[in-house]
Amino acid sequence: MTTNNGFDSLHSHAQRLKGASIPGLLAAEPGRVQDLALRVGPLYVNFARQKYDAAALQALLALAADRDVGGAITRLFRGEQVNLTEGRAALHTALRGDVVDAPVAAEAYATAREIRQRMGVLVRALEDSGVTDVVSVGIGGSDLGPRLVADALRPVSGARLRVHFVSNVDGAAMQRTLATLDPAKTAGILISKTFGTQETLLNGQILHDWLGGSDRLYAVSANPERAAKAFAIAADRVLPMWDWVGGRYSLWSAVGFPIALAIGFERFEQLLEGAAQMDAHALDAPLERNLPVLHGLTDIWNRNLLGHATHAVMTYDQRLALLPAYLQQLVMESLGKRVQRDGQPVTTDTVPVWWGGAGTDVQHSFFQALHQGTSIVPADFIGCVHNDDPYTINHQALLANLLAQTEALANGQGSDDPHRDYPGGRPSTLILLDALTPQALGALIAMYEHAVYVQSVIWNINAFDQFGVELGKQLASGLLPALQGEDVAVADPMTREILAQLKG
């Protein structure tokens, strides 16, 4: 479904390239590998194995110019009201740097810096308190980002604090976490933007009771009064966040409190520095050399012009194993929309399904389908040039597999035996971090954030609301009393029957 006139010339390019092979594109454009490579700080990204040529890329860039992608990026940074449905700015960039001369953004940056200083005081106090473990309770944006960064960057040994994450309302998750801990040496953090999230409130109550009160409870919320009241948490242990920061963009805020506890406050600030470096690039680089713009346009090409319905992310670094889950929320919650900013139906398909895993494990699970299945799945392959562990041969083998898989997916290999024939033609983007440092991870995450925004501008949708998550939560709230024995009228016949089965 791509009927928008802005895509007309792109359709002709897609048709022209229908029979092209990726090796053929590389041969036809001798400088392609260098021309389609960009470096931004610690990140190197190469698009040469995508299935477009220079002419098609110019048409994509013309579409971006026509949709005023550059102006939209500036409006985002300046703190203009880009979240129209909720009447808000989206100033997550101001959490990590002061890169634009605009009063709203400058005020947000100053506010965020002040709260970050408060957070640093709390981090150091906890490090010196005798507490050994911290349980962080949150879900969605209050969990996925902090969990990813803490897992990726936590030291192998010598950490002052061990941080554990609980998100699911399933009591088994909390039970398994608490079973390994000593309540006398444990603190808890409750993270919720509204402090009305069912999962966080229920898990928070379990944690509060297990700790024997609120003396070692902390909270992060855009509703600090409600947070303090719900669990009697002292005001000096409640850190604010703001309605101009969406949950899935909030790890840079006080939502990153558990990150700072897990990796140290200085390294948390280095994470922000890496993101700010990518912000400056996204804001200042011309479209044709703008990494997030090119990444976003590549995703537009694969979705709308080539018709690919899913996108895979393979992290050839075990420490980034949680990145695909994080990106699922970032991309699919931001871009999973069926109406434009003015409420009219979209005229193109929007977000594909994002999924993935860590290499080389994934080679022994779903790579069979990637190589020989009937659906072509564009992919991002992410690796690190340098490793931090002492097992050099293992790291060399890991990188050899990364390179081999991208080559095999793109080039394929013919065979007289159809069962052993590899068709190739599977596009991928290669992303290399110099090493898995806080700066590099910050830059990587910020790149994806901006690429998502670029796509939202092209599709004319709002990347910063998420009304699609509300209906199921509302229905669950109405059904909970029925499972607790109350007589509740249930209109849906299937739900009514299953409730009867559940209640015996």
Swiss-Prot record:
PROSITE patterns: P_GLUCOSE_ISOMERASE_1 (PS00765), P_GLUCOSE_ISOMERASE_2 (PS00174), P_GLUCOSE_ISOMERASE_3 (PS51463). The active site is at E333, H364, K473. It is found in: Cytoplasm. GO terms for molecular function: carbohydrate derivative binding; glucose-6-phosphate isomerase activity; monosaccharide binding. One of its GO terms (cellular component) is cytosol. Keywords: Cytoplasm, Gluconeogenesis, Glycolysis, Isomerase. It catalyses: alpha-D-glucose 6-phosphate = beta-D-fructose 6-phosphate. InterPro entries: G6P_Isomerase, G6P_Isomerase_C, Phosphoglucose_isomerase_CS, SIS_dom_sf, SIS_PGI_1, SIS_PGI_2. It comes from the Bacteria. One of its GO terms (biological process) is glycolytic process. Its main location: cytoplasm. Its EC number is 5.3.1.9. Pathway: Carbohydrate biosynthesis; gluconeogenesis; Carbohydrate degradation; glycolysis; D-glyceraldehyde 3-phosphate and glycerone phosphate from D-glucose: step 2/4. Belongs to the GPI family. Catalyzes the reversible isomerization of glucose-6-phosphate to fructose-6-phosphate. This is Glucose-6-phosphate isomerase. The lineage of its organism: Bacteria, Pseudomonadati, Pseudomonadota, Gammaproteobacteria, Lysobacterales.
